[in-house]
Amino acid sequence: MTQRPLLMIPGPVEISPAVQAAHDGPVPGHLAPDLIEAYRSALHDMRALWQAPAEAQPFLVPGSGTLAMDMAAANLVGPGDRALVVGTGYFSDRMAEILRRHGADAAMVSAEPGRPVALEAVKERSEEHTSEL
């Protein structure tokens, strides 16, 4: 077996040998019974993992984290809605930009790099910038 470099980035992520082996097989059709059952099982397991009620609908997003962030913004905010983003680095900056692209008035509260965002600062900023999200 050939050694490959260890990924130490936010994504894509390392996968187990079993998952890699599954990828080595033929690509199933989107209506294949085995794929439908695997999808149903994954949704069931997600509900159990998150202790979600039966009526909750989890989603498997076959895309990047940015796609999931964009989906959340598209479904949670509209033009003129206000949102407060706690700035913790690159991905929170990206979330604020995505919210703005969906028309939201996104405010940020941050701290110096390497420092935590103070809870009091979040409270103060949320009082100044009352937000729907």
Residue ranges of each PLM-predicted region?
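Generic hydrophobic alpha-helical segments
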Residues: 42, 46, 72, 122-126
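A glycine-/small-polar-enriched, mobile loop at the entrance of the PLP active site in fold-type I
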Residues: 4-62
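Gly/Ser-rich phosphate-binding catalytic loop and adjacent alpha/beta segment
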Residues: 85-125
